[in-house]
């Protein structure tokens, strides 16, 4: 991640680190290990990496960031003028469309999954996209709840937990990257469906067994009249 020089990737990595703090039971150990890994890694990176990352705090004077702001403006204007479905895949960054709103400016990718979808598929497309993300978080929470504390479903619980962290990284890092259709995000969403079905089936079977045991105990020890 650090070797990619991507500010969006760094944001995603920071989101994963923060999520880990709230998930782990051994926070002090986790923080100590995080520091042991992060400090040498940052010292190992060249000056060009630090200069690029420092541009996050100097966004107002960074030409690359200004290009993103221009792209966000174009995405909004395109969604407004081509309501409700936008102009299609990669439309807003086409020179002819981009310069129609910002004459003379260099066309620029949105570098944000949210503005990318807004410009390409309009307000309705963005709404559907956000609902999909929200549904993925809700589903992962349901899977974790159904599988928590059940030894034979531990793998389902762990997978749902990691998918949830993956979604957090995608949503945070994606705010600075044009990766709206990233295949790992699609795979995360797709995997949650069978995981939920498996967790529901296992939970229902466990409940059925408990009910059968309770009924048998009542039959063996009838309540006196």
Where are these regions (language model features)?
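Hydrophobic alpha-helical segments of polytopic membrane proteins
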Residues: 1-45
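Long extracytoplasmic/lumenal interhelical loops at the membrane interface
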Residues: 57-121, 142-157, 162
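Membrane-interfacial, low-structure loops and terminal tails that flank and connect transmembrane helices
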Residues: 142-157, 204-224
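Juxtamembrane transmembrane-helix termini
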Residues: 3, 7, 26, 49, ...
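Hydrophobic transmembrane alpha-helices and their immediate junctions
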Residues: 17, 121-166, 188-192, 197
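Transmembrane alpha-helices of multi-pass inner-membrane enzymes
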Residues: 35-36, 135, 165-219
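Membrane-interface catalytic loops of GT-C/OST-like multi-pass glycosylation enzymes that act
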Residues: 4-8, 108-112, 176-186
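Hydrophobic membrane-targeting alpha-helices
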Residues: 4, 18, 43-45, 136-143, ...
């Amino acid at each position: 991640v650090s070797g990619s020089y991507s500010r969006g990737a760094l944001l995603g990595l920071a989101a994963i680190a923060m999520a880990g703090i709230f998930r782990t039971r051994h926070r002090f150990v986790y923080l100590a290990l995080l520091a042991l890994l992060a400090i040498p890694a940052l010292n190992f990176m060249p000056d060009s990496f630090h200069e690029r990352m420092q541009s996050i705090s100097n966004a107002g004077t960074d030409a690359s960031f200004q290009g993103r702001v221009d792209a966000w403006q174009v995405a909004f204007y395109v969604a407004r003028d081509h309501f409700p479905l936008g102009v299609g895949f990669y439309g807003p960054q086409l020179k002819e469309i981009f310069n129609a709103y910002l004459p003379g400016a260099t066309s620029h990718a949105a570098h944000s999954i949210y503005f990318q979808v807004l410009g390409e598929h309009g307000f309705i497309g963005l709404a559907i996209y956000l609902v999909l993300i929200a549904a993925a978080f809700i589903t992962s929470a349901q899977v974790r709840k159904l599988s928590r504390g059940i030894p034979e479903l531990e793998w389902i619980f762990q997978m749902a937990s990691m998918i949830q962290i993956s979604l957090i990284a995608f949503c945070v890092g994606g705010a600075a990257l044009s990766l709206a259709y990233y295949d790992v995000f699609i795979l995360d969403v797709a995997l949650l469906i069978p995981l939920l079905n498996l967790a529901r089936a296992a939970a229902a079977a466990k409940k059925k067994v408990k009910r059968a045991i309770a009924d048998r105990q009542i039959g063996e020890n009838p309540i006196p009249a």
